[in-house]
Swiss-Prot record:
GO terms for cellular component: DNA-directed RNA polymerase complex. Gene3D superfamilies: RNAP, epsilon subunit-like (3.10.20.730). The gene is rpoY. This is DNA-directed RNA polymerase subunit epsilon. It comes from Limosilactobacillus reuteri (strain DSM 20016). Pfam families: RpoY.
Amino acid sequence: MTFKVYYQADKTKRPVRENTQSLYIEADSEAEALLMVEHNTDYNIEFVEQLDEKALAYEKQNPNFKLTTF
C-alpha cells in the first residue's frame, strides 16, 4: 500500500500549514508507515493518509512524485 505522509521538517518550531511538506512511502499498514518515517527522520509528522488507486494515480501526475525508501 502507498501512503502519503504530511510533515513539518522542524520539530522545534510550531507547525504552520503553509510549511507542510509530504512524502510517499510503501508500507503494509498506516502504523508501519508512521514508524518508518519516525525512526528514519526528525520530522514532525502531522498525518498519514493511505492512497487508494484513484488518489495514487492523481498523485503520480505530479512531476515531483517519488516513493521514499529508507
